[in-house]
UniProtKB/Swiss-Prot annotation:
Record keywords, A-Z: Heme, Iron, Membrane, Metal-binding, Monooxygenase, Oxidoreductase
Expression triggers: By various alkanes.
The protein's name: Cytochrome P450 52C2
Keyword Iron attached: yes
Enzyme class: oxidoreductase
Function: Together with an NADPH cytochrome P450 the enzyme system catalyzes the terminal hydroxylation as the first step in the assimilation of alkanes and fatty acids.
An MF annotation (GO) of this entry: oxidoreductase activity, acting on paired donors, with incorporation or reduction of molecular oxygen, reduced flavin or flavoprotein as one donor, and incorporation of one atom of oxygen
Organism: Candida maltosa
One Pfam family, short name: p450
CDD domains: CYP52
Length: 510
């Protein structure tokens, strides 16, 4: 027994010594410099307990984690720092070059998406956002053609939902005064996303007007799906924060919500896999995402996992973008006036709104990009080191030297802080100024990554931008004036899977 323990201790010492020598060799080879460290104020902070619980509280209750990280970077006068978390060591960096390195195809083997698969698996299974390696590659190959440009061009399918949205806004404005656009944008995006994905809408907007669903699906199943959508996402956000302790987030409400999500999607999946190839081809003429996917596989679980993954991403990011865009427009009358003039000239009627005319409207793109810069829909990106590796910047007093990232370290990239760097985005980076994009590259430059970058970059990027553009154009076409009814300008942001306005987006149109 003693001999075995002695051998184990010796082996551990040898392993740790070899690891130390290897890391020192890496640091010397790449001229690495140390990263600034969050000062330890207690035993708890040394173990990571205080940072972990403070971060969780900030994210799930106060919505201030994005600001907290920015303030920490500013107070340390750095672009990168290291801290202890309950789940291990964490590096926070707002260096765009580090983000691009982590996400590049050349370094994919150096990094994993951490505990994300474990956290998201109850809802998304092995879908594209919760898988890695060969499983992820297969998902990517299968889904990429469905997001081809010619399919995104079919934007006229949005108009029926746009008419419902406009009717609700007009009705609410006439009867109740200010209207909260945030839940309406979430209703619009889930209606359109479900139509695009399944060929049938959730009909949330229609029910908002007192109408009834005309589809073959049980109306209560639709209502259940839409009503628990946000609750399930909030649970998943907490699971991602907890990392290896994600199993602690488990309740009857959570599992009931998952069941309702799966039940909704299963209805459409079973309908698709029961079709013959000839029937699928016939149904695909109107372009339904599910039917395109079912041509490649009839595996019910694969279809369900991928559909829920796309729905989760597509609905939230676009609704968040629209909510914050109109919040900013309602507080910047000069921007609304300019956008109104541009839209009236470029899009005289509904028929003039095409994929090509949207792509050619620079000022509209500036407004969308500026909203994504100031209020990124997904405020964080992260990776976990799969082995000892190097990031190109963040070390030393001037943060210009490479840094060593140890195996198991989590690297967090806060877009909220990165997007507020004057050296990349010009003067007054805290302010909403669409005109700044006149002097920036058309794609935003290497520091602008609202949809991530590299092989895992969002497949639905163009789809989301076209959808947000269409909604914006139609509302600007319909109304001449926009006025804010928010009590204060600085938006209070709630960070979950995406960011939301804590106090909503209360406006009035004329």
């Amino acid at each position: 027994m003693i001999d075995a323990l002695y051998i184990l201790i010796v082996a551990l010492v040898i392993y740790k010594t070899a690891q130390f020598v290897h890391r020192k060799s890496l640091e010397k080879k790449h001229h690495c410099q140390p990263v600034k460290q969050i000062p330890l104020v207690s035993i708890l902070s040394g173990l990571g307990f205080d940072m972990f619980f403070k971060d969780t509280a900030e994210m799930t209750k106060n919505g201030g984690l994005h600001k907290k990280l920015q303030q920490m970077l500013e107070s340390l006068q750095t672009t990168t720092f290291r801290s202890r978390m309950l789940t291990g060591s964490q590096i926070v960096t707002m260096e765009p070059e580090n983000e691009r390195t982590m996400c590049s195809s050349a370094h994919m083997k150096d990094w994993t998406i951490g505990y994300r698969p474990f956290a998201l698996k109850p809802l998304l299974g092995d879908g594209i956002f919760s898988s890695e390696g060969e499983s992820w590659k297969h998902s990517r190959i299968m889904l990429r053609p469905i997001f081809a440009k010619e399919h995104i061009k079919q934007i006229t399918a949005m108009e029926p939902y746009m008419l419902l949205l406009i009717e609700i806004i007009k009705s609410s404005s006439a009867n109740e005064g200010p209207v909260d656009l945030q839940p309406l944008f979430h209703a619009f995006t889930i209606d359109y996303a479900s139509d695009f994905l399944f060929g049938e809408s959730c009909d949330v907007l229609k029910e908002n007007l007192g109408g009834k669903s005309t589809s073959g699906m049980d109306a209560q199943v639709k209502r259940d799906f839409a009503s628990v959508f946000n609750d399930v996402q909030n649970y998943l956000t907490k699971r991602m924060m907890l990392g290896p302790l994600a199993f602690l987030v488990s309740s009857k409400d959570f599992h009931d919500g998952i069941k309702k999500q799966h039940e909704f999607v299963s209805y459409f999946v079973q309908k698709a896999i029961s079709m013959s190839d000839e029937e699928l081809n016939d149904e695909s003429k109107n372009y339904v995402f599910l039917y395109q996917l079912a041509k490649q596989t009839k595996d019910a679980k694969v279809l369900q996992d991928e559909l829920l993954s796309i729905l989760l991403a597509g609905r939230n990011t676009t609704a968040s973008l629209l909510s914050f865009l109109f919040f900013e427009l309602s507080h910047h009358e000069n921007v609304w006036t300019t956008l109104k003039e541009v839209v009236d000239q470029s899009f005289p009627d509904v028929e003039s709104i095409t994929f090509e005319t949207i792509q050619n409207c620079d000022y509209l793109r500036w407004c969308l990009f500026e909203s994504l810069r100031v209020n990124p829909s997904v405020p964080f990106n992260s990776r976990t080191a799969n082995k000892d590796t190097i990031l190109p910047r963040g070390g030393g007093e001037d943060c210009s030297h490479p840094i060593l990232v140890k195996k198991g370290d989590q690297v967090l990239f806060p877009l909220y802080a990165s997007n507020r760097q004057e050296k990349y985005f010009g003067r007054k980076p805290e302010e909403f100024i669409p005109e700044r994009w006149r002097d920036l590259p058309k794609t935003g430059g290497p520091a602008f990554m609202p949809f991530s970058t590299g092989p895992r970059m969002c497949l639905g990027q163009q789809f989301a931008l076209i959808e947000a553009s269409y909604v914006t154009i139609r509302l600007v076409q319909t109304f001449s004036k926009l006025k804010s009814h928010s009590l204060e300008y600085a938006p209070k942001r709630l960070v979950a899977a995406t960011i939301r306005l804590i106090d909503g987006c209360f406006v009035s149109f004329e």
